[in-house]
Amino acid sequence: MQHLSRTVSPALPHPCLRALRAAFPQTIPVLAGYFVLGLGYGIYVQSLGLPVWMPMLMGTVVYGGSLEFVLASLLLGAFSPLSAFLMALMIQARHLFYGLAMLERYKGYGWRSFYMIFAMSDETFSITCSATPPEGVDKGWFMFFITLLDQLYWVGSAGLGAALGTVLPFSTEGVDFVMTAMFTVIFLNQWEKDQQHGSALIGLAVPLVCLMVFLSLIHI
């Protein structure tokens, strides 16, 4: 009796799993950056005397990076909704333009669109604009997992930093300078990379003008 050989093709992984596998390598640079910044943020929040869970809560609900550094100090000051609103608007206004740029890209993905809009950070915006999912990978799930992984990196690193802040044997004074240092390095890299320094100078001038304008409004 002749036996017919049958070739059984292996089952393909679930579309979500394929998208997750494709998205993870795209987010490794973000993981490296968020790990350092998140640790600094968590240690900073802990040094202010706030609860260990606070940086994780703000990373989940606010997820605003530099805004979270400012909010941590605002929580210890006098209650001033107008000041908090103006400060948040000044820091995060760029996300209004991010959202406009991503309207078509995020269209048609149901509940995932709402989450991706909420959790769109600078780094996530950059990746989702430039990265292309491999063949056979659902684009919606691909962008969703990029967004989710980036936020998980930040929340986890902030929580770890807060936990370490409770046991660190040295003073954490000055750790809030980490964000200033990061933006200084970005400015210097931009200055060295481009022969034309117009964009770097604009990036330096705009925050200074906004700082003067918003501070004058706050103290009116």
Provide a role label for each language-model segment.
Residues 12, 85-176:
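Helix-loop-helix junctions within the multi-pass membrane cores of secondary transporters/permeases
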Residues 1-21:
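Short, Lys/Arg-rich, polar N-terminal cytosolic tail immediately upstream
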Residues 218-220:
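Conserved small/polar residues in nucleotide/adenosyl-binding loops
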Residues 15, 22-117, 153:
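Pore-lining transmembrane helices
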Residues 46-47, 76, 104-105, 162, ...:
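Transmembrane helix-loop junction
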Residues 36, 159, 174-186, 201, ...:
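Hydrophobic alpha-helical segments embedded in the membrane of multi-pass proteins
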Residues 189-199:
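Membrane-helix interface "capping/anchor" motifs
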Residues 39-43, 60, 70, 127, ...:
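Alpha-helical transmembrane segments of multipass membrane proteins
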